[in-house]
Curated annotation (Swiss-Prot):
It is found in: Virion membrane; Host cell membrane. One of its GO terms (cellular component) is membrane. Residues 1-8 are virion surface. It comes from Mumps virus (strain Edingburgh 2). Residues 30-57 are intravirion. Interacts with host TNFRSF1A, RIPK1 and IRAK1; these interactions interfere with host NF-kappa-B activation at the level of receptor complexes. Interacts with host protein UBQLN4. Pfam families: SH. Belongs to the rubulavirus small hydrophobic protein family. This is Small hydrophobic protein.
């Protein structure tokens, strides 16, 4: 029994660590992509607005 117990505990710890890392990575990735997409959208809107104004004249 003691031979089986430590590996299970270790695997559980590893799984928890992996889960934490994945959630952190996904959260940071989503935050970064959201910020960049918002920035790009605002830039695109601004340039598009300028282009439409220029071409209307």
């Amino acid at each position: 029994m003691p031979l089986i117990q430590p590996p299970l505990y270790l695997t559980f710890l590893l799984l928890m660590l992996l889960y934490r890392i994945i959630t952190l990575y996904v959260w940071s990735l989503s935050t970064i992509t959201y910020k960049t997409s918002v920035r790009h959208a605002s830039l695109y809107q601004r340039s598009f607005f300028r282009w439409s104004v220029d071409h209307s004249l």
